């Protein structure tokens, strides 16, 4: 059974005449007649009662007509969906993320993408960078979002944008630092860094930044994540450095101030298989790059 046979049958049923159906289909009558006969032979039933005035559906034909219409509609829908999928307009994108990217970057990306490609679906999973790389290779995620990815063969790391650094300190320490929020001033402060796992990391970058400025950091704790670091800061256990997206969120007993002498910025990056041909990933990257150009 072919879609062509279904189209010819539906046209003949709706017109009540094979000749009229042929004119509607912009073909000659004999092919329509042959294909309807072939369809009847395939089904093993008569679909039409034929007369000099035209054709009339048999009970079997009337029952088959509704199914034929549904099959034709399904065929059209399937073609449309397959073409949309090839353009990345539908399909599921699986994303792994880590750390402070969830505060502004990930929500902004997801909002922009769902506005541009409403037919796509998204899934998010919190996972360390090492697991993101493993998941990319295994095909269980299409994209990772985070910072300071290691160089890996077959993996592309694309910097999306850069954020300035802020000092985060408890209320009493912040009052002292506010007049001189510099790396040099932090030389005498206890420093809480994050994260503990996943080298290279934000903690490594902060240490390197301070050493480039001639300051040997007094690291008193390296904790699991930014929330743990800010918890210690709020308790007066030290200070930490955070990206601008974290500084923008108000927290009890924590004050933030932009670094006065640090021009360095930290990247937010996307990572994916270099040779990926997943259309919905390509569509997502196009949206992300357009947004990058607007920053």
From Swiss-Prot:
Keywords: Activator, Aromatic hydrocarbons catabolism, Cytoplasm, DNA-binding, Plasmid, Repressor, Transcription, Transcription regulation
Biological processes per GO annotation: catabolic process
Broad class of where this protein is predominantly found: cytoplasm
Keyword Cell cycle recorded: no
Annotation: DNA-binding region: 18-37
CDD domains: PBP2_Chlorocatechol (cd08446)
Location within or outside the cell: Cytoplasm
Keyword Transcription attached: yes
Single GO MF descriptor: DNA binding
Family classification: Belongs to the LysR transcriptional regulatory family.
Free-text function comment from the UniProt entry: Involved in the regulation of 3-chlorocatechol degradation. Transcriptional regulator of tfdB expression. Acts as a repressor in the absence of its effector (either 2-cis-chlorodiene lactone or chloromaleylacetate) but acts as an activator when its effector is present.
Name of the featured protein: HTH-type transcriptional regulator TdfR
Species of origin: Cupriavidus pinatubonensis (strain JMP 134 / LMG 1197)
Top-level taxonomy: Bacteria, Pseudomonadati, Pseudomonadota, Betaproteobacteria, Burkholderiales
